[in-house]
Amino acid sequence: MRPAHAEPSRSCRRRTAGPADHDLRGRCLHERWRTGGIQERAAHGHARDRCAGTIDRPLLVYLFDPYCPWSYGYLPALTHLLDAVRDEADVEVVTIGLHDGTRIDQAPAPMRAVQRATGVGFGPGYRRALAEGEMQLRSRDAAAAVIGMTAADPGRVPDVLWAVHRAFFWAGRSLSDGATVAQTAQRLGLDGAAIEVFASSSRAAQMAEEDFHLARDLGARRGPTLLVSHGDRLCELEGPGTSGQHLVEQFRGVLARP
């Protein structure tokens, strides 16, 4: 059995119709159902336009956790891929729910291993928070923030992921803190106050739980997983340690298969 953050198997499987099928489109994942206005969602507690999208394009599904150091390390390669295929594929981010109140000193990042494999660095704020050991990691709160930011600007998924990861792994800020969420959103040019309100709502918590359930159905592990849904195939691309160009080549290979 390979380690949680080792190179994925790059496996592909055919999806057949049936009650147990991981049919992403059937679960409205592919149709960008999170594109309702943040302020309206915060006020009314529901998502709009759940099924308004393009179903003929391949779908990249990224399973990750904002508090996962290997997800942070995967970002350079993932960003390269998303930039390269932005006109060819839709993208959906699904959070996996890694932590539920874990203290930061009980989940220290393997900083040397991540930096050696991926090149990302860890900032003084994160190191200080780790040394203090008091922060509690609640993935549900972090997921709600990600959902709010990606819904506010669906075309900037890489920017949102970088901003959220760096808020924690560089600045050492808690993603359960409303001020952190608002400031992170504002730096992206988004309405920080509205996103803070949404992220603290019961609807955001419900949507985060929906993510966690979907991630489990899709076989999420404790590290990042990148899937391509194309036709009747669901394929896994390589994980942390690979290059962005290699991900592009793998993606094109999936599309080229009969």
Give the positions of each predicted feature.
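Short cysteine clusters
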Residues: 4, 68-71
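Structural alpha/beta surface segment adjacent to cysteine/selenocysteine redox centers
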Residues: 72-169
